[in-house]
Swiss-Prot record:
Tree of life domain: Eukaryota
Pfam family, one: DUF4680
This protein's name: Uncharacterized protein C5orf47 homolog
Segments for region (Disordered): 51-102
Comp. bias intervals (Polar residues): 66-76
């Protein structure tokens, strides 16, 4: 029997992973997708627990065990505890799940490796910074030239005054 999809969200990614950059530590941020539909799944640690429970021999075929079997509740009441992304508990859960940049790249099959992407980003940033530095230097040179012209005009005018006396 096919379950009806009336109360379910449309197909799509349940979680979105974003690599950290700048002054943040290396790792992966967990962002929830499709917030507008009001569906919130289990947290990172609960997801691992459900995967482990699915592998146990008690689970039938490829079916996912229910919340009580996996020790996971899919109720929205547990969502406020899962939302705190900066809590140290979230880092521990990510470490337990074995999520880092390398296996995140392998799992989600990014088009280019993350270290290559960071190299490209650094090169682009250097190029943009250099163009700004070059603009500042060219402005300074232009100001210097105009100042020299002004000084030269003052010298010429002072020489004319001295010669006229």
């Amino acid at each position: 029997m096919v379950p009806s999809r009336s109360g379910q969200r449309p197909d799509g990614p349940r979680l979105i992973y974003v690599t950290r950059f700048a002054s943040h530590r290396h790792g992966v941020w967990q962002l929830r997708g499709l917030r507008g539909f009001g569906h919130r799944g289990p947290g990172l640690g609960a997801r691992c627990a459900s995967k482990q429970a699915a592998v146990e021999p008690g689970a039938r075929g490829g079916e996912r065990p229910t919340g009580s079997q996996a020790g996971v509740t899919d109720t929205p009441d547990s969502a406020p505890f899962q939302r705190r992304s900066r809590a140290p508990r979230a880092r521990e859960q990510a470490a337990q799940a074995g999520l880092n940049q390398k296996n995140a790249a392998k799992e989600f099959d990014f088009p280019i490796p993350l270290n290559e992407a960071s190299k490209l980003m650094k090169e682009r940033k250097k190029a943009s910074v250099w163009s700004k530095v070059q603009q500042v230097i060219s402005r300074m040179i232009a100001e210097n030239e105009s100042y020299r012209r002004r000084l030269q005009c003052q010298r010429v005018s002072s020489e004319i005054r001295v010669a006229a006396r």
